[in-house]
Swiss-Prot record:
Composition skew (Polar residues), residue ranges: 550-560
BP GO annotations: double-strand break repair; establishment of meiotic sister chromatid cohesion; meiotic DNA double-strand break formation; meiotic sister chromatid cohesion; protein localization to chromosome, centromeric region; reciprocal meiotic recombination; sister chromatid cohesion; synaptonemal complex assembly
GO molecular function, one term: chromatin binding
Name this polypeptide is given: Meiotic recombination protein REC8
Organism: Saccharomyces cerevisiae (strain ATCC 204508 / S288c) (Baker's yeast)
Higher taxonomy: Eukaryota, Fungi, Dikarya, Ascomycota, Saccharomycotina
InterPro entries in the record: Rad21/Rec8-like, Rad21_Rec8_N
PANTHER family (alphabetical): MEIOTIC RECOMBINATION PROTEIN REC8, SCC1 / RAD21 FAMILY MEMBER
Compositionally biased spans, kind Low complexity: 278-290, 436-446
Cleavage, annotated site positions: 431-432, 453-454
CDD domains linked: Rad21_Rec8_M_ScRec8p-like (cd21790)
Length: 680
């Protein structure tokens, strides 16, 4: 690049070569367009990355002249420089092509916008003012104008919005096509039928053989029905020239409107309604008795329909008030549910326009009046639970049954409902049966021996059913006494606060025989109670010495315990392993235990060796010394004894020992398994 920058820096003839060389050096990404800079991410050095090539410079480059200049310097430059210049020419040609195509695309978009929004017909005589010669609103290429010229219509200065020229337009169209007159009349008659029947579905009327108009409608008309099946009497000779405004006054009149055939007549529920759209002036000129007699029927019918929603609502209110008065005289307060108003389907869809306009304009006033009437007539009713529970003649019976079902209301008197319909002091917490809804699967991928505050057993050596495990998933929450209405956990200074209950729960590690991540042998993976069940055997000891010693040592305490009540073990919170071990102790007490009455409330007694088998006695006597399955390991024995101490601390079991002859060594002597007595 040095030869170009030094020799041809100020020469205008070689300015194109400089731009081409810059494009080849910087690449195709750095171009300055409309003050937008595109930085080059290639490995460029120095200040080359900050250089830009303007769009104007690229457009001013002449590709043929640049190629001629490169050809003239072919002998002076090396092949490397020539190849770089040709690469720059390629980039320049690519950018110029993009610029040209973008400009053409922009011009095309502008032309399309002008063609759609600002196009005007070249020939003013081809503007559409109604129908063309072919009775077609939309023109075609056979005419002097194209489709684009037919998109917009010129405004008609003679158009009057108060007049509706639709009928004249249709008549002109039908007169030009005489063959379609009969079909048009049939279609118009069918439109009248559809309008009066207030429905657009005619699938139920399948019999079309007796229809006079079916033959004239052609094959394109479907879902029609015979005229005999019309629910109302219709005059099909009604003249559409009588256009009625929104105020109900006729704007125009035709000569045929003075005939009787222009009267709109129909029957509704046995009443004949006649609407005559005659001129008001002629009606006033024909005053007298004849006019009053002729209009007596229509006016009377119109007044009946003007009652509308207000008359119907008043009748319903009167009926409801009579029923309520009758029930109040009899002295019955029950059957309130039968007094609720039912939703009725209003089939009266043939109200005159005056009645409909009156109801629409005074809708809010009528609804407010109707609401006030209902509130005035039903102010003595109370919608509380007493009106739903009680029934006629059997108030106490039904109320007792309902209160037995809804146990939350058992401590509320029936007389208090009227004063405090929502002041219930008891709330069902719903935790007693929550254990049946909890999944037994752990969300962790690592096998866990703890679920919440429960340390559950290993599933490999489980002899219990899954129902027993489900009963203890949440630390036996059914044992937590939450009968708040009985006030077990409400203190004296709590003033009946239902949230003041016992939260003295044990920690999550309570009663666990081992930690979760501890390293243990394969033999310790089995359940402790399962290991004890397989290794226990009947004890050969007797309780001859214990009977005498227990009576002498605990005579005073036993007499005091006889006067005390039994311990309520249901209030004690146990984890799963401890409860399972306690059930195992109860089973062993039934099998090998002896009956005792010296330590109430415990009724059975046994030795510790009956619960936790040991190898100590086997080693001394020599019997079954090779049977290693008789005793248990030290880990299992220590864990079982720890659970036994926890039960003794909670008062679930009681531990005692044989008396020692030497009082000096009483506190220093270690007790054997057959010297510790367990009461359960």
């Amino acid at each position: 690049m040095a030869p170009l920058s030094l020799n041809f820096k100020d020469d205008k003839k070689y300015k194109g070569l400089t731009t081409v060389w810059l494009l080849s050096a910087l690449g195709n990404s750095i171009v300055k367009e409309s003050n937008n800079y595109y930085s080059n991410k290639s490995n460029s050095t120095g200040n080359i990355s900050s250089s830009t090539v303007k769009k104007k410079d690229i457009v001013n480059i002449s590709i043929p002249k640049t190629c001629d200049e490169i050809q003239n310097f072919e002998n002076d430059f090396s092949l490397r420089y020539i190849s770089n210049l040709l690469y720059g020419v390629t980039i320049c040609y690519n950018k110029k092509t993009e610029y040209v195509l973008n400009d053409l695309n922009h011009l095309l978009v502008q032309l399309q916008k002008n063609d759609v929004y600002a196009f005007k017909a070249k020939n003013k005589s081809t503007r559409i003012n109604g129908l063309n010669s072919n009775n077609s609103i939309i023109g075609n290429k056979n005419n002097n104008y194209t489709w684009e010229e037919c998109v917009f219509f010129d405004d008609d200065p003679l158009y009057d919005i108060t007049k509706v020229p639709a009928l004249e337009f249709l008549n002109t169209t039908l007169q030009d096509n005489v063959s379609f007159i009969e079909e048009a009349k049939s279609i118009r008659r069918q439109d009248y039928i559809n309008e009066l029947s207030n429905s657009n579905r005619f699938e139920l009327h399948g019999d079309m053989t007796n229809s006079d108009a079916q033959s004239n409608l052609g094959s394109n008309v479907r879902n029609s029905f015979p005229l005999d099946e019309i629910p109302v009497d219709v005059d099909f000779n009604l003249d559409l020239d009588d256009i009625v405004s929104h105020q109900g006054t006729p704007l125009g009149s035709h000569s045929s409107s003075q005939k009787d055939g222009n009267d709109f007549k129909f029957n509704y529920q046995g009443d004949e309604l006649v609407l005559n759209f005659e001129n008001d002036n002629e009606n006033n000129s024909n005053g007298g008795e004849d006019t009053s007699v002729e209009n007596e029927g229509p006016v009377a019918n119109l007044k009946d329909y003007e009652l509308g929603l207000e008359a119907q609502a008043s009748e319903e209110e009167n009926d409801l008030q009579q029923k309520l008065n009758t029930r109040m005289q009899r002295g019955h307060r029950a059957d309130v549910g039968g007094q609720f108003s039912k939703v009725q389907f209003d089939a009266k869809t043939s109200y005159p326009n005056e009645v409909l306009k009156f109801n629409h304009g005074n809708y809010s006033h009528l609804m407010e009046k109707n609401r006030i009437r209902k509130l005035t007539g039903q102010n003595f009713l109370t919608s509380n639970i007493s009106s739903l529970v009680r029934s006629c003649g059997e108030e106490e019976f039904f109320s007792t049954n309902w209160l037995s079902i809804f146990n939350d209301f058992s401590n509320i008197k029936t007389s208090e409902w009227d004063l405090y319909p929502q002041g219930f002091s008891s709330v069902e917490r719903g935790r007693k049966r929550a254990h049946s809804l909890v999944s037994t699967q752990s969300s962790s991928s690592t096998r866990s021996h703890e679920y919440g505050r429960k340390s559950f057993r290993n599933n490999k050596n489980d002899n219990y059913s899954s129902d027993m495990e489900n009963d203890n998933l949440l630390l036996n929450l059914e044992q937590i006494n939450e009968d708040l209405e009985d006030g077990h956990y409400i203190e004296e200074n709590s003033q009946g606060n239902i949230l003041d209950f016992n939260l003295n729960l044990p920690p999550s590690s309570f009663g666990r025989s081992h930690t979760r991540n501890s390293t243990r042998s394969s033999g310790f993976n089995e359940d402790i109670v399962g290991a004890l069940r397989r290794r226990v055997g009947p004890s050969e000891q007797n309780f001859a010495e214990e009977d005498d010693s227990s009576n002498s040592c605990f005579s005073d305490g036993s007499q005091q315990n006889l006067q005390q009540d039994k311990t309520n073990f249901q209030d004690v919170i146990l984890d799963y392993q401890t409860k399972k071990f306690y059930d195992y102790i109860k089973e062993r007490s039934i099998v090998v235990g002896r009956t005792t009455r010296s330590n109430p409330p415990f009724k059975r007694k046994m030795l510790l060796v009956d619960i936790i088998p040991s190898r100590m006695g086997e080693a001394q006597t020599g019997a079954n010394f090779d049977d290693v399955e008789r005793g248990v390991s030290r880990q299992i024995a220590a864990s079982a004894f720890l659970s036994l101490l926890n039960l003794a601390t909670k008062g679930m079991v009681k531990l005692n020992e044989y008396p020692v002859a030497d009082a000096v060594t009483k506190d220093l002597k270690l007790r054997r398994e057959d010297e510790i007595i367990v009461y359960a």
